Amino acid sequence: MKKKILLLSLLFQSLMYSQQDAWIYLTDKENVAASISNPITILTQKAIDRKNAQGIAIDVRDVPVTESYITQLKAQTGITVLAKSKWFNAVHVRGSEVDINALSVLSFVDYIDFADKSLNTGRPSVQQSKFD
């Protein structure tokens, strides 16, 4: 009897805490041209000086992720925003598989990439580089 209770509790616990991690890739960024033409609004002077010293141009990767997109993701039921990447224009989230998949209907979501690769369905087979 003890073994059955232990087995059931372990099964229930794994179902209860089945949180998934995923990167939500976004379609675009707001005010890209304005941000690039006035880089001090998105980068510190020290960062601008470092890029200039290395001969690295300021581009779309330096523009932050659109804050209204992050706010909308945070407002979704069962979703916790853990991190954001301006280089990839993506947000790292945690939630149930169902809650994360529900984000795909948002107009600004390009695709979803689960940490558990077996959950990745519907992702385009060929991705265009965001840096071209």
What kind of feature is each model-predicted range?
Residues 1-24:
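Bacterial Sec-dependent N-terminal signal peptides
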Residues 128-132:
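Short, intrinsically disordered, charge-balanced linker/junction segments flanking boundaries
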